[in-house]
C-alpha cells in the first residue's frame, strides 16, 4: 500500500508541475518537505505506541555474547546455503527500486513525462506486491500443503520473465545515461514497462513472504540472529549492486540477476527439501486431536505463578506435546531459570502416580 500511495502522490506532483523530465526546485522542496514530515509523524506514532500488557524476561546474554553467537551462526552450513537466497533478494531489490526506474527515466522513446511514468511504475509495483500478498494470505494453510518452494519457484519464473522483458524493452545504455535508442527487440513502450513493474513487485512478494516464513519456522529459537544475518547479506549485496550498476550496461546487470535467481531458487529448494522437511518428519506431532501448545516456551514468571500450568495439563491430556516443540523450548530456555521451569514442566506432563 505504501508504494501505491507514494506513487499516486508523486504522479499528482509531477503531473501538475510545469516541467517534463526535469524536477524543479519547487517540486524538490514539496517532495522533501512532505516525506520528511511523514517520517517525523511515523516516528512519533511509533514512540507513543502502547507497551504490551506483559514484559518478557530478557535473555541473560551480553551484547558481546549475542554478537559472537551471530557470527558463529553466520558460518554454519544452513546459513551459508541460505546466503545465496539472501544475496539475491538484495541484488533484486536494488534492481526494482533503483536500476529499473533509472531505465524508465533515461529511455527518451517512452515520452517526455518520464517522471510521471516513474510514479505510475511505483503504483504498478505496489499493486503487484499487494495482489501477491493477498493471494498468499487467502491461501493460508494451503501454502503449507503446496510447499514454500513452489511459491518461490513461481516468484523465480516471474522474475526471469521480468528480466527477459526488460532486455527486450530497453536499450543497453538506459541504466547509465539518457538514450534515444530502441530496445533490443522492439521500441520501448509503456504497457510493457508497467507490466514489468507489476511483475517485479509480484515476484518480490513471493520471495520475501516465503523467506520470512522459512526463517520463523526453521530458526524460531534464534530469530534475532537469523534476521540479522538475513539483513546483513541483503543490504550488503544491495549496496554492492548500487556501486557497480553505473558501470554496467543493462544486459550485464540482467545476466547477474538471472544467474543469482537460479542459484537462489536451487538453494531454497535444497534447504526446504533436504534439511527442514526431513527434520520435521522425524518430529511430526501425533494425530490425536487436542489443544496446541504455544509456539514459545514458558517464562520463569509464568512457571512460578502457575499461569502456564493449566495450559500444559490440557495439552498433555491430549498427548499433543511433540519432540519438535520440546526441542525448540529447550533451546529458548537455556538463558532462563532452567531448572525451575523444567521441573514444573515435566511434573505436569508426567505426574507422579502417588497423590498427596
Spans of features found by a protein language model:
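Non-transmembrane, juxtamembrane loop and terminal tail segments
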Residues: 57-68, 279-323
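Cationic, low-complexity basic patches in intrinsically disordered or flexible, solvent-exposed regions
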Residues: 333
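Glycine-rich segments within core transmembrane alpha-helices of 12-TM secondary carriers
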Residues: 1-17, 122-132, 230-244
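Membrane-interfacial loop- and helix-cap regions that link adjacent transmembrane helices
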Residues: 41-227
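Symmetry-related core transmembrane helices of the 12-TM Major Facilitator Superfamily/SLC fold
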Residues: 29-47, 254-271
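C-terminal transmembrane module of eukaryotic multi-pass membrane proteins
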Residues: 191-274
Amino acid at each position: 500500500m505504501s508504494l501505491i500511495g507514494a506513487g499516486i502522490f508523486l504522479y499528482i506532483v509531477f503531473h501538475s508541475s510545469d516541467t517534463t523530465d526535469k524536477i524543479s526546485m519547487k517540486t524538490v522542496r514539496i517532495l522533501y518537505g512532505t516525506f520528511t514530515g511523514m517520517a517525523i509523524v511515523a516516528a512519533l506514532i511509533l514512540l507513543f505506541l502502547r507497551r504490551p500488557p506483559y514484559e518478557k524476561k530478557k535473555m541473560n546474554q551480553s551484547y558481546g555474547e549475542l554478537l559472537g553467537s551471530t557470527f558463529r551462526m553466520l558460518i554454519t552450513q544452513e546459513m551459508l546455503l541460505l546466503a545465496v537466497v539472501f544475496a539475491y533478494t538484495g541484488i533484486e531489490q536494488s534492481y526494482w527500486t533503483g536500476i529499473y526506474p533509472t531505465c524508465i527515466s533515461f529511455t527518451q522513446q517512452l515520452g517526455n513525462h518520464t517522471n510521471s511514468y516513474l510514479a505510475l511504475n511505483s503504483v504498478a509495483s505496489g499493486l503487484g506486491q499487494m495482489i501477491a500478498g493477498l493471494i498468499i494470505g487467502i491461501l493460508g494453510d494451503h501454502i503449507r500443503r503446496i510447499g514454500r518452494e513452489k511459491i518461490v519457484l513461481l516468484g523465480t519464473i516471474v522474475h526471469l520473465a521480468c528480466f527477459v522483458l526488460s532486455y527486450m524493452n530497453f536499450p543497453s545504455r538506459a541504466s547509465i545515461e539518457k538514450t534515444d535508442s530502441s530496445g533490443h527487440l522492439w521500441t520501448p513502450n509503456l504497457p510493457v514497462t508497467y507490466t514489468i513493474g507489476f511483475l517485479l513487485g509480484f515476484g518480490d512478494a513471493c520471495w520475501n513472504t516465503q523467506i520470512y516464513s522459512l526463517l520463523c519456522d526453521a530458526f524460531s529459537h534464534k530469530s534475532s540472529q537469523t534476521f540479522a544475518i538475513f539483513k546483513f547479506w541483503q543490504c550488503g549485496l544491495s549496496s554492492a549492486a548500487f556501486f557497480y550498476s553505473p558501470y554496467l550496461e543493462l544486459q550485464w546487470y540482467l545476466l547477474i540477476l538471472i544467474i543469482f535467481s537460479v542459484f537462489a531458487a536451487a538453494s531454497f529448494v535444497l534447504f526446504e527439501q533436504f534439511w527442514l522437511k526431513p527434520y520435521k518428519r522425524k518430529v511430526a506431532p501425533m494425530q490425536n486431536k487436542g489443544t496446541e501448545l504455544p509456539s514459545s516456551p514458558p517464562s520463569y514468571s509464568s512457571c512460578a505463578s502457575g499461569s502456564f500450568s493449566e495450559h500444559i495439563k490440557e495439552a498433555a491430556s491430549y498427548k499433543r506435546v511433540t519432540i519438535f516443540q520440546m526441542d525448540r523450548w529447550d533451546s529458548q530456555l537455556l538463558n532462563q531459570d532452567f531448572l525451575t521451569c523444567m521441573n514444573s514442566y515435566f511434573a505436569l506432563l508426567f505426574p507422579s502416580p502417588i497423590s498427596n
